Structure formats: structure tokens, C-alpha cells
Amino acid sequence: MCKEIEGQKLFGSAIILAGGRSSRMGFDKQFIEINEKRLIEITAGRLAQIFDEIIIVTNRPEMHSCCQYKLTSDIIKGKGPLGGIHAGLLAAESEFVFAIACDMPYINLDYIEHMKCVVESSIKAGEDIDACITLKGEWIEPFNAFYRKSLVKSIEEHLESDKRAVYSLLKQLNTTYISEFEARRFSPDWSMFFNMNTMEELRQYSQVTQEEKPNGKVEIL
């Protein structure tokens, strides 16, 4: 595990983007339950092993009233994932903030620690880094990634110009990319980037969960 650079709180905050239209799934994915516990809370608990601050970005905070984690909502409404990242960065305390979506059930802590090391190495080398992103071929993986808190202004300007794509923003930034080859050393099947968009994908994940825990079940609220 990498150590923090002296005098700087580089890491410590993680944001989970919850909700969205979920048109292909047919319901709000932030309310999926696995083994009688919300998937988003399972994700938060896993991340809490290596982060001091967990922030859930949700458009329905009243549905998380019993949640032990910090809640926030989009400041700039209706802008998709980038609006959620913006809200999470505003609420976060650390300089670099880990971001993941609520429908990504496979949390790879070893890879997160590896990304921290990549960020630290870049800083120690004197590089100005705004984000640490994984590539799959020529495509980017915008989640399971780190973003710098100071990007808030850049994101606001990007959204104000009616641009919502994370990729178009990253092209303007000092982005450090991790290759697919390197990332697959930690997740050969790419499961750490798997997200559930359809009922079939939910059933597949349910089946895996039930195989791991015979009494496992998936519930949709």
C-alpha cells in the first residue's frame, strides 16, 4: 500500500453515484437489495475499509434517511453522471476522490490501491494530474476511477457549454490512463468494471450471489 505524501491528504473520500433513469432496467437501481441489504450499502461498506469518507450522490436522499454515510444531491440537475461527479467532488474532503456507480457490485480493493500508487507516482514525478482512468481498448472506464477535487470548476464550465460526456472532459485535462493490459492483472474477467443495466444482467449477478450464498436472493424495491 502506498503512503500519503507528507502534508497532503491525497486520498480518503469515495463517492457512489446512485440512481438515474435506469430505463433499460425498468426501476431505480439504487434500491436493489442483495441478501436483504441494499447493494449500495454493501458497496459503501466495502469501500469504507480503505476510505475515511463515503459520499452517496442521490436524487432521492429521503430514501436513505437511515444511512450512516454522507448524502448529497446534484447541484447542476439533469446532467447525468458528470453532474453526479461534480456534486460528489464538492462534498468530498480529500484532494483525490474515488468514484464508482451504485450498479457496480464487484469492488476490487487491490486495484483501487494500485490506482492510488499510480497517482502518487505521477505527483512525485512532478506531473500535474487531474484524473486516473482505466482504458479498455480505446474506450474509457469513467467509474472505478479517481478525480481531483479541483476539477469542480472545469466540470461546471463543461456542463455550461452543454457538454455532458465524461470522455470529452477528460480529453481537456491532465489525465493519467491505465492500460487494459495492466488493469487485467487485477481483474482478468473485467468484473471490476461490470455494471448492471438490464434485468438479465441482474439475474446473472443474482445467480453468482446465490451460488456463493445458498440463501442469497435479490429484491427490487
Curated annotation (Swiss-Prot):
Compartment list: Cytoplasm
Entry GO terms, CC: cytoplasm
Keyword rRNA-binding: no
InterPro entries (alphabetical): MobA-like_NTP_Trfase (IPR025877), Molybde_CF_guanTrfase (IPR013482), Nucleotide-diphossugar_trans (IPR029044)
Keyword S-adenosyl-L-methionine: no
UniProt-annotated binding residues for GTP: 17-19, 29, 74, 103
Cofactor annotation: Mg(2+)
EC number: 2.7.7.77
Entry's Gene Ontology BP terms: Mo-molybdopterin cofactor biosynthetic process
Catalytic reactions on record: Mo-molybdopterin + GTP + H(+) = Mo-molybdopterin guanine dinucleotide + diphosphate
GO MF term (any one): GTP binding
Amino acids binding Mg(2+): 103
Keywords, comma-separated and alphabetical: Cytoplasm, GTP-binding, Magnesium, Metal-binding, Molybdenum cofactor biosynthesis, Nucleotide-binding, Transferase
Family statement: Belongs to the MobA family.
Job of this protein: Transfers a GMP moiety from GTP to Mo-molybdopterin (Mo-MPT) cofactor (Moco or molybdenum cofactor) to form Mo-molybdopterin guanine dinucleotide (Mo-MGD) cofactor.
The record's note on its domains: The N-terminal domain determines nucleotide recognition and specific binding, while the C-terminal domain determines the specific binding to the target protein.
HAMAP family in alphabetical order: MobA (MF_00316)
Protein name: Probable molybdenum cofactor guanylyltransferase
